[in-house]
Amino acid sequence: MKPDAHLVKQFLLNLQDTICQQLTAVDGAEFVEDSWQREAGGGGRSRVLRNGGVFEQAGVNFSHVHGDAMPASATAHRPELAGRSFEAMGVSLVVHPHNPYVPTSHANVRFFIAEKPGAEPVWWFGGGFDLTPFYGFEEDAIHWHRTARDLCLPFGEDVYPRYKKWCDEYFYLKHRNEQRGIGGLFFDDLNTPDFDHCFAFMQAVGKGYTNAYLPIVERRKTMAYGERERNFQLYRRGRYVEFNLVWDRGTLFGLQTGGRTESILMSMPPLVRWEYDYQPKDGSPEAALNEFIKVRDWV
């Protein structure tokens, strides 16, 4: 089957609806929708839930942008895209819970196609999901990674190990020599063996996110916590901000293509703190996080 951008767009809009419904069912609060248009072509639907029962902030964004020429960030490592019109669409979401024992989560699925007359279209899928705990629970990490592995298995034995490794490498803060969290899946430039296969995999990742995340939320959301845990959560959220502003290609692409800044930066936590030369106490649960987020085989 030829690449069908309309089919992908319909799936993405439905996925946004489904994920918002599932998060609302857990939290009780409703999302507020903000529809926007991009002057250069396209637009999107940003949905944000704030100060809910479980989630301090959850943002689920759909965007579909198109234009006559590619931005520098995209053509730098893909010169074949120069001189082509493009369409980029995706659903991207980040959930920042109140309770420090509930991890932050991020997921994204996207499709890109660039065309010019008389040439075959250049297209690919990308996406994944990753988990950023503040306090490590082995059973949560195992569930997260088993869910990721199980959704990958129908597409091949090598898919989960490959995309887990890519995720570990991508969500890494070089300037801190730290992983952002415990990873999950990350894939990009997926266009083989054919459109149908790649689209099916992207759908599996999009649908798999809540299966991986919501059982962890349910397990941890009522755990008692105090000021110490909250302070540590806010401190560790700083790493999230550092990664998104310094290393994340998606953030850079969005800002360079004249995307909607409010939507692009919706992934930012609502409250964060930095502390100069912070060192957790030896033997404390906070100190244990550094070991917990080191790359390992969870399944």
Curated annotation (Swiss-Prot):
Q: In which pathway does it act?
A: Porphyrin-containing compound metabolism; protoporphyrin-IX biosynthesis; protoporphyrinogen-IX from coproporphyrinogen-III (O2 route): step 1/1
Please give the cofactor(s) recorded in the UniProt entry for this protein.
Mn(2+)
Record region (Important for dimerization):
240-275
| Keyword Cell wall biogenesis/degradation belongs to the record | no
Under catalytic activity, the entry for this protein gives: coproporphyrinogen III + O2 + 2 H(+) = protoporphyrinogen IX + 2 CO2 + 2 H2O
Keyword Transmembrane helix recorded: no
Give the positions the UniProt entry annotates as the active site.
H106 (proton donor)
Residues annotated as binding Mn(2+): H96, H106, H145, H175
Q: Name one GO molecular function term.
A: coproporphyrinogen oxidase activity
Domain of life per record: Bacteria
Instruction: Kindly list the residues the record flags as site (Important for dimerization).
Output: H175
Q: Sorted alphabetically, which PANTHER family does this protein's record hold?
A: COPROPORPHYRINOGEN III OXIDASE, MITOCHONDRIAL, OXYGEN-DEPENDENT COPROPORPHYRINOGEN-III OXIDASE, MITOCHONDRIAL
For this chain, the family text in UniProt reads: Belongs to the aerobic coproporphyrinogen-III oxidase family.
Give the function comment from the record: Involved in the heme biosynthesis. Catalyzes the aerobic oxidative decarboxylation of propionate groups of rings A and B of coproporphyrinogen-III to yield the vinyl groups in protoporphyrinogen-IX.
Name of this protein? Oxygen-dependent coproporphyrinogen-III oxidase
The protein's organism comes out as: Escherichia coli O7:K1 (strain IAI39 / ExPEC)
What is the primary gene name for this protein? hemF
